Amino acid sequence: MIETDRIISANTVQTKDENSIDRAIRPKTLAEYEGQPAVREQMEIFIQAAKSRKDALDHTLIFGPPGLGKTTLSNIIANEMEVELKQTSGPVLEKAGDLAALLTNLEENDVLFIDEIHRLSPVIEEILYPAMEDYQLDIMIGEGPAARSIKIDLPPFTLVGATTRAGLLTSPLRDRFGIIQRLEFYSVDDLAKIVYRSAKLLDLDITDDGANEIAKRSRGTPRIANRLLRRVRDYAQVKASGVISYDIADKALTMLKVDPVGFDHMDHKYLLTLMEKFGGGPVGLDTMAAALSEEKGTIEDVIEPYLIQQGYLMRTARGRIATLLAYNHFKLKIPDSLSSDQQQNLSL
């Protein structure tokens, strides 16, 4: 995962203080969990059924873009099941012994949460298969001719895997999850509720319009909404009476160069370069990287996804093309030099 310092990126590296605040305002139960109605309804049923049978919840895979609450949902699952949660990540599990130590310390029905599960090594995956299916740990002791396999029985447990790249999971691993949940981007209404709830937990005064304005610029992502709330709080404390109103939220976010649709300076630079320097495209990735002085990976993984999701950019076989939405957003005239085919693409 490429990390960045953009305030509107869900991959932004957070400080210890920010992480501790995030943990404090996370919902602890499904009743407190805003948004994702289908996921919430399904998980309520699955958890109640497992508890009534006194069984471990089926292994659960949660995937979706960063910042939508995969870790939060895993904690909620453990809280609702009234069990302990052990947490790790795919890159950390380098040796068989690392995973074996975690598995042998689980109590009955505990939750083992593995973030970035798509980054597990093949060796670790092979150990997970019998653990997930049969609750058995199958490990090799010794080396060479003296090596032998031993089986250790494990208590029933729930593996919760989280990933932003579900397509990178191997089929054998993916097929062993009984529950698969995709988290979608949040609506403005749901994000406004999250902002309002977070503000109250942080003992902040906020109006409905103020919460709504922060939500509109948060790119459908709770992590970004909570980060923007903290920055608007700072502005309100220094420049106003501390109350976060629409006017204060608008001024603070404008100062931070986050526009009404959630674009920041990098989004503006990308789209304006594409439209003003290259006539809207099509433009190849190498050319855009050189024009922006950015790494190709940063462009593909950090800048472009949101622009594509929101319909401001198309990635075609011939290159990147700015859409009609992009021209309208910046109030730019569509060049007459564009071919009829490109004009048709722009109007889609």
Curated annotation (Swiss-Prot):
GO terms for molecular function: ATP binding; ATP hydrolysis activity; four-way junction DNA binding; four-way junction helicase activity. Residues 4-186 are annotated as: Large ATPase domain (RuvB-L). DNA binds at R315, R320. Its main location: cytoplasm. Residues 187-257 are annotated as: Small ATPAse domain (RuvB-S). Residues 260-348 are annotated as: Head domain (RuvB-H). One of its GO terms (biological process) is DNA repair. Keywords: ATP-binding, Cytoplasm, DNA damage, DNA recombination, DNA repair, DNA-binding, Hydrolase, Nucleotide-binding. Mg(2+) binds at T71. It is an enzyme of class 3 (hydrolase). GO terms for cellular component: cytoplasm; Holliday junction resolvase complex. The keyword Nucleotide-binding applies. It is found in: Cytoplasm. It catalyses: ATP + H2O = ADP + phosphate + H(+). The RuvA-RuvB-RuvC complex processes Holliday junction (HJ) DNA during genetic recombination and DNA repair, while the RuvA-RuvB complex plays an important role in the rescue of blocked DNA replication forks via replication fork reversal (RFR). RuvA specifically binds to HJ cruciform DNA, conferring on it an open structure. The RuvB hexamer acts as an ATP-dependent pump, pulling dsDNA into and through the RuvAB complex. RuvB forms 2 homohexamers on either side of HJ DNA bound by 1 or 2 RuvA tetramers; 4 subunits per hexamer contact DNA at a time. Belongs to the RuvB family. Homohexamer. Forms an RuvA(8)-RuvB(12)-Holliday junction (HJ) complex. HJ DNA is sandwiched between 2 RuvA tetramers; dsDNA enters through RuvA and exits via RuvB. An RuvB hexamer assembles on each DNA strand where it exits the tetramer. Each RuvB hexamer is contacted by two RuvA subunits (via domain III) on 2 adjacent RuvB subunits; this complex drives branch migration. In the full resolvosome a probable DNA-RuvA(4)-RuvB(12)-RuvC(2) complex forms which resolves the HJ. Has 3 domains, the large (RuvB-L) and small ATPase (RuvB-S) domains and the C-terminal head (RuvB-H) domain. The head domain binds DNA, while the ATPase domains jointly bind ATP, ADP or are empty depending on the state of the subunit in the translocation cycle. During a single DNA translocation step the structure of each domain remains the same, but their relative positions change. This is Holliday junction branch migration complex subunit RuvB. It comes from Francisella philomiragia subsp. philomiragia (strain ATCC 25017 / CCUG 19701 / FSC 153 / O#319-036). The gene is ruvB.
